[in-house]
């Protein structure tokens, strides 16, 4: 077997192996670890992507939710797939796992709780709760903390679908686009405005 170094920007840790008339691309993946804060529907989608092998370079090592049963459900699903995932009951416990990335899928309040400690921990953040960053003082604190600690905060479109499409339409110049978004009545459960009659409308 002859190993040929492959200097591909797509596969920086790859090399070609030639065996007879066949060539094989061998890739060493630098696995990144991540944790999830908030174990609702979006966290379920992310964890299922791990189970299905759609995120081969990432390992989910811990989950946290104020509702422990939700975190246990995700960790249980990971265990069924032969993957280890810790159920954490505090933010400190989650960050003690020293993840590369924290995926925040909970709420603006959760981002306020996790952002600065995570960034100081050497953990970058992917957040779906961008509303918390509308507070100028908090935004500046997060940016400064990230710079000081060599970490990053990635702002995702979040639970409101269509923002990526709207950004694309904006790049088209004189395009016109309309965006409609509806949430089901279950999204209001546990709030003062929820009424059972909403289920029938």
Where are the language model's segments positioned?
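Beta-loop-alpha module in the N-terminal Rossmann-like domain of NAD(P)-dependent dehydrogenases
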Residues: 89-120, 132-135
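General beta-strand structural signal in soluble alpha/beta enzymes
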Residues: 104, 127, 153-157
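A short helix->loop->beta-strand "cap" motif at the edges of active sites that frequently abuts
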Residues: 85, 121-123, 148-151
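Rossmann-fold NAD(P)-binding glycine/threonine-rich loop
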Residues: 130-151
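Conserved anion/nucleotide-ligand pocket segment
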Residues: 151-201
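Conserved N-terminal Rossmann-fold NAD(P) cofactor-binding segment
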Residues: 68-97
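N-terminal Rossmann-like dinucleotide-binding module
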Residues: 27-77
């Amino acid at each position: 077997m002859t190993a040929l170094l492959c200097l591909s920007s797509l596969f920086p840790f790859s090399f070609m192996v030639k065996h007879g008339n066949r060539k094989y691309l061998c890739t060493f993946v630098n696995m990144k670890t991540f944790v999830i804060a908030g174990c609702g529907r979006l966290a379920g989608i992310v964890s299922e992507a791990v189970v299905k092998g759609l995120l081969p370079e990432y390992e989910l090592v811990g989950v946290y939710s104020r509702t422990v049963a939700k975190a246990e459900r995700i960790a249980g699903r990971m265990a069924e797939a032969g993957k280890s995932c810790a159920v954490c009951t505090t933010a400190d416990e989650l960050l003690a796992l020293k993840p590369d990335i924290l995926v925040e899928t909970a709420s603006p309040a959760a981002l306020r709780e996790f952002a600065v400690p995570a960034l100081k921990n050497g953990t970058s953040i992917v957040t779906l709760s961008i509303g918390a960053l509308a507070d100028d003082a908090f935004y500046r604190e997060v940016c400064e903390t990230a710079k000081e600690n060599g970490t990053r905060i990635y702002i995702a479109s979040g639970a409101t679908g269509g923002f990526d499409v709207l950004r694309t339409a904006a790049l088209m110049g004189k395009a016109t686009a309309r965006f409609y978004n509806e949430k089901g009545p279950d999204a209001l459960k546990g709030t003062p405005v929820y009424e059972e009659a909403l289920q029938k409308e």
